[in-house]
Amino acid sequence: MNRLASIALTIAVPIVASAHIGNPNVVFDGTAGAYPVRVIVRPPEVVPGRAEVIVRVDAGDVQHVLIRPVFWRVGVSGAPAGDEMHRVAGQDRAYTGQLWLMAYGSYSVYVTVSGACGSGTAIVPVASFATGRLPLSPALGAILIVLGGVLVGGLLTIVRAAAGESLVPPGEPFDEAKRRRANLVTAIAAPLLALAIFGGAKWWRAEDTGYRRTMYGSPAADPTLSVDATHRTLRIAVHDTAQFHAIYSPVTPDHGKMMHLFLVRLPGMDAFAHLHPGQSDSLVFSGEVPAVPSGRYRLFGDLTLENGLSLTVTNFVDIPDAKGVVTPSDSDDAWTLAPSATRIAPGATTLLGDGFTMSWNGEGAPLIARRATDLRFVVRDANGAVAQLRPYLGMAAHAVVVRDDASVFIHLHPMGTVAMVAQQVFAIRDRGDTTSDGRLRADALGSGAMPAMSMSGELTFPYEFPKPGRYRIWVQVKPMQRVLTATFDVDVR
């Protein structure tokens, strides 16, 4: 009975925004029609479960804010009606609400804002997966054991009464023969009840084993490196596991690239590369390793699927010294070196190259884990003026955040943690033009900038650090012809 109680409440824990590692929450900065919004989606602890949604509307006379979970397989037509959000006490422009995520797979939270400027909707992609288990607490286990004992005792009492006193007509004595018969029936019922309990425990263990087999984990990436006199070619094969196969759809380009690959040298995180290997098969990617020094690297590969899911594959790779001049396989590849002993903290300014500098406007309050924050940076030219940037992969800037133990990885944009192409695939699915010649018509912007995107050198990345620790942040911009990378470090409380 104790063993049964110990597993009786093992439950699934989902991760939302599994496109990244160690980041449970989704953060989006954008617009819902004419209204500028920030949306934060916090995952539920179980699936099915309720996700917490926080929406901040920064301008406009707002009358209603509705949130709606849209599952990829059913689309908007099969989604439930929107739920009204409620204002946060003491914050006129902040709203809170909860949504049920009922299944594993690709969701989007549709945020509809209505007011004096009309109505508009923002689409925030969310991935819902079972990725862990929670053990039963000792206190609750003890309570369940006591209640189970009471239930078993009650059932045996009912059996004894049914075979004994209940069969005695009114006024007749309950003699020894009837008592022996009642005891015999109770003795027969006891092992049958024990067998039922054993069968229930065995069934639950089978359910738990089946659940473990289907728990989602980051798909395995198998890297191999081929080295000759002039090339260091990295090939990454993504394993199509049973869990991955259950949610798989073809890979689609995000910002014009089939994969965004990041290399971080460990343990000092003193070398960094943002690469774009080509797709040689459905789940095989390859490209040249640039002029980064030899060492052990942690690789993170961002993929976006045609069903709107984004995911990150990861592994380690040992890179030897280059034997000759290395030519990048993609013109948008970029890399940088930053000695691990150099700590460029918030409030500091670092040289980018080509006469440009980048400053982190973060000398104020300390950064607190699990609290929404704005990472603000300013790019200036040689004259000290705020630089005008060129699009780099469709964005004014990209940022990568990695904890010093590599347990946290996130690829950020000024719009937040979401993949832009994931928003696009949900939007075009609503219009009914999801595919063209059997393939998704997505990422129409490719590497160009979004039409309404600011290209100012004043940059803001919305983010929530998931846990305390030391983090390294790489910020990439393109003020001239080449991509420049700044490196910063921060301690999060």
Write out the residue ranges for each language-model feature.
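Positively charged n-region of N-terminal signal peptides that target proteins for export
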Residues: M1-L4
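N-terminal soluble domains immediately following signal/targeting peptides that reside
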Residues: A19-S166, P173-P191, A196-R493
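Bacterial N-terminal signal peptides
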Residues: S6-P14
